[in-house]
A protein has these predicted regions:
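Acidic, serine/threonine-rich, charge-biased low-complexity segments
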Residues: 1-269, 278-279, 283
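Extended amphipathic alpha-helical scaffold segments
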Residues: 31-35, 45-53, 191-195, 205-213, ...
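Amphipathic alpha-helical elements of HEAT/ARM-like alpha-solenoid repeat scaffolds that form extended
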Residues: 44-47, 62, 204-210, 291, ...
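Amphipathic alpha-helical scaffolding segments
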Residues: 65-70, 226-231, 348-356, 367-374, ...
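Alpha-solenoid helical repeat scaffolds
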Residues: 176-184, 192-196, 255-327, 334-418, ...
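Long alpha-helical HEAT/HEAT-like repeat alpha-solenoid scaffolds in very large eukaryotic proteins
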Residues: 392-395, 450-604, 617
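Conserved small/polar residues in nucleotide/adenosyl-binding loops
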Residues: 643-650
Length: 654
């Protein structure tokens, strides 16, 4: 048996190999047993030991021999069990060899012994449950370490005045701490890994479905499973991304290996898995439902192959209908993105997948993505790690280090955008001096993160547990003012962000009679168009309002600070672009006139909303409604002229 190119070629045909195995069995083994009175079980043990020593290069011959031996399946499993038990004995320093796992996996695949028979020897009693308990405890400990601060993790202080000798004298001299029991041997897990490497998926499918935590605790098992997934995804829809780039060296020597994935090729050697027919019986998948069924046992642990995640997102983006993909995106892809830490490339692929969905459907995905973070230990750990990184970045961010802070902010947001932006908005509600540096730092975000940020902003604005006004009932709460100002600055600076959800939310709130959220509309107009609510007018503004449309627009514009005329002109151009985007969004979503009507209705209805409200609060609310109504009306009028005025070509036609 030798390696040639990408396959392993045998030097003899199966018929010749079977004949040689039969001849050796009759003339050598059985004859020696009868002539010398050898122990038959001991002979079987020697055969299996020889098989183990030559499993990589000569497994076909030994399989032919084992198929013809006179011992029963139970007897072969028993002898193998004794070999496994030898390596779990406390006096044995060697670990179980990989060749023994490979030998057993081949025998199970060839139906010589069954997986259930071997499982009784390699994982007796409650070994699997103990391994799961140890894995859960490790995750819990890691999560607790992330949530603890440096003070709680520090060692207790020593009292200098306390007599250490007296303390030591009270401790019995013969007291010895009991050593913790050794962890159970994961032989059963490694046997499953060997079976997956050999392509025996049907034998372990039920066991993996009952114990999905194995994929998270033992990444090598996941890699062996994903190898089968990649092979079965070799279909026209997946083929372009599945193609692997083989080595180009012509002088490389092929070397057999029993490890999966194969070791990286060197300048002189290329490694090939020794079992050449590992993919026998695994046909390529033709239906999307079959792909989901194959990936279902992995759950969120598909995160261990970021290339596969990108491939699935690309295929989903090209799908004519995404209804079949939605459960898969909710339960596996989005949580896997959190654990994969794939950075911006993975988020770009995910955005291509979901950008065509309507925003209510996208936001439902984001909401489940966020709230699913508390259901698994791995996701809880990722959530707490993201929260800690977000707080650390916000403590260091300032207007002086926007470039460095922006890159750090984007890198931290890539892992879990929903959780990260929740922390950012919570800090902005308390510290409005973070608005400007955070807005400037957001330029490194991906389109998906811009969309998630809009969702997080909408969720923060609609929080029913926070009061919209202060205790005096007159002034708007600081948290709402901060969020409104942040929203206006954000939508003005980044054209990739869509403010349609915020405008629709304002329309819904006004329809319910809630006027406190009008401050969000006012800030959007102020920040994006530069039109501020009219307060006490100066003489110059009064004179400008008596002029034409251009002078009236100048009277409503906010004061633009600038050291040079060029800076002022640049700021004016930015306001014009932001105003056009806002007006276009209102017109395309048919919200311009409904919002105008709703604001006008609230101006009339706000004074009759509640009989118990103080007259000062009512008058303040009425003044606010009137001011914002005039602000919004002037915004619509000033930009409606740009859309309705005929062009020179239209004038010539008329």
């Amino acid at each position: 048996m030798y390696a040639d190119g990408d396959t392993v070629v045998e030097s003899e045909t199966p018929r010749d190999r079977d004949a040689r195995a039969e001849s050796w069995l009759q003339t050598s083994m059985l004859e020696c047993i009868g002539r010398f009175g050898l122990d038959a079980v001991r002979v079987l043990d020697i055969i299996l030991a020889s098989f183990c020593a030559h499993a990589v290069h000569h497994y076909p011959f030994f399989l032919s021999v084992i198929r013809r031996v006179p011992w029963s399946s139970a007897r072969i499993a028993e002898v193998l069990g004794f070999q496994y038990a030898h390596y779990t004995h406390p006096d044995t320093r060697e670990s179980t060899p990989e060749e023994l796992y490979l030998l057993t996996a081949l025998l199970i695949r060839e139906k010589v012994v069954s997986f259930a028979q071997m499982l009784a020897y390699v994982s007796p009693d409650d070994t699997i449950q103990k391994l799961k308990q140890a894995h859960d405890e490790a995750l819990t400990s890691k999560t607790a370490t992330v949530g603890a601060n440096a003070l709680t993790m520090a060692a207790p202080l020593i009292d200098d005045d306390h007599d250490s000798s007296a303390a030591s004298s009270t401790t019995p001299a013969n007291t010895v701490d009991a050593a913790p029991p050794p962890p159970p041997s994961p032989q059963g897990i490694f046997l499953i890994r060997a079976l997956l490497r050999c392509g025996a998926l049907d034998e372990v499918r039920g066991f993996l479905a009952a114990h999905p935590w194995i994929f998270g605790a033992y990444p090598s098992v996941t890699h062996a499973y994903l190898r089968l997934v990649w092979y079965r995804l070799d279909t026209p829809a997946f083929r372009d991304a599945v193609t692997r780039f083989a080595g180009t060296g012509n002088d490389q020597t092929s070397v057999l290996t029993m490890y999966v994935p194969e070791p990286h090729a060197t300048r002189t050697h290329r490694y090939i898995f020794c079992v050449r027919d590992w993919a026998h019986g695994h046909a390529p998948l033709n239906q999307v439902e079959e792909v989901f069924e194959l990936l279902s046992p992995l759950g969120v642990y598909v995160c261990q192959d970021r290339r596969l995640l990108q491939l699935l997102c690309r295929v989903c983006a090209q799908a004519p209908s995404k209804e079949a993909w939605m459960p898969f995106l909710r339960t596996q892809v989005l949580p896997a993105v959190t654990l994969a830490n794939g950075g911006a490339p993975l988020l770009y692929e995910l955005w291509e997948c979901i950008q065509t969905l309507p925003y209510p459907q996208r936001y439902s995905l984001y909401g489940e993505w966020k709230h699913r973070s508390t259901k698994r230990p791995e996701l809880r750990y990722a959530k707490m790690r993201t929260e800690r990184e977000a707080r650390g970045i916000l403590r260091r961010i300032s207007s002086d280090n926007v470039r460095a802070s922006g890159r750090g902010l984007a890198k931290a947001a890539h892992a879990h955008p929903t959780v990260f932006f929740e922390v950012v908005l919570h800090q902005i509600q308390s510290y409005d001096n973070l608005i400007e540096p955070v807005v400037d730092s957001a330029k490194y975000l991906t389109p998906l993160e811009y969309d998630v940020l809009t969702y997080a902003l909408l969720e923060a604005l609609s929080d029913p547990g926070k009061a919209r006004t202060k205790q005096d009932g007159t002034n708007t709460s600081l948290w709402l003012k901060s969020l409104a100002s942040f929203a206006g600055a954000l939508f003005r600076k980044y054209a990739a962000m869509d403010c349609t959800p915020i405008l629709q939310y304002l329309a819904n709130r006004l329809h319910e009679g809630q006027v406190a959220d009008l401050v969000v509309l006012s800030e959007l107009i102020l920040k994006m168009a530069g039109i501020e609510p009219m307060g006490e007018l100066s003489d110059a503004q009064m004179a400008a309002l008596s002029g034409g449309p251009l002078l009236q627009t100048e009277a409503h514009l906010t004061l633009i600070p600038g050291t040079t005329p060029a800076a002022v002109l640049l700021a004016r151009n930015s306001l014009k672009k932001g105003a056009m985007r806002l007006y276009r969004t209102l017109m395309q979503n048919r919200l311009a006139v409904p919002l105008l009507i709703l604001v006008a209705q609230q101006r009339e209805a706000c004074v009759f909303s509640d009989d118990d409200v103080h007259i000062k609060s009512l008058s303040s609310t009425f003044d606010t409604c009137v001011s914002i109504l005039l602000q919004y009306t002037h915004f619509l009028m000033s930009h409606c002229l740009l859309y309705t005025s005929p062009s020179p070509r239209d004038r010539q036609k008329s």
